[in-house]
Regions:
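Intrinsically disordered, low-complexity acidic/polar segments
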Residues: 17, 28-30, 44, 54
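A generic structural signal for beta-strand entry/edge sites
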Residues: 5, 30-32, 54-58
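Acidic, low-complexity intrinsically disordered segments
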Residues: 43-85
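Intrinsically disordered, low-complexity linear regions
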Residues: 16-18, 30, 69, 73
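Negatively charged, low-complexity tracts enriched in Asp/Glu with abundant Ser/Thr
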Residues: 1-28
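Short aromatic-centered micro-motifs
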Residues: 10, 35-36
């Protein structure tokens, strides 16, 4: 799998979003993705279980002063999956 950074553009809440995704590391076959919006680091996400029971995307690390939109994280995760398909 290519771990080069890539751009995603998609619609979220009726607004176009542009996100840079930087795959940053791989541990035990799990890849972590740094998410950059407007050239600013927002958070690192990874696939995993949400609330311990359903598959989805979760935050592995975040910038303390940034708010987190859980719906946006799930949308970005789906877009990452689509990018690799």
């Amino acid at each position: 799998m290519d771990l080069s950074p890539f751009l995603l553009e998609f619609k979220h809440r009726n607004k176009m979003q542009s996100v840079e995704v930087r795959p940053c590391c791989k541990e035990e076959n799990v890849i972590y993705y740094d998410i950059w919006i407007d050239n600013q680091y927002q958070y690192t996400i990874t696939p995993g279980l949400i609330n311990g029971d359903k598959p989805g995307w979760r935050i592995a690390l975040k910038n303390a002063d940034k708010t987190v939109d859980q719906d946006l994280i799930q949308t970005i995760g789906v877009e990452i999956e689509s990018y690799y398909l």
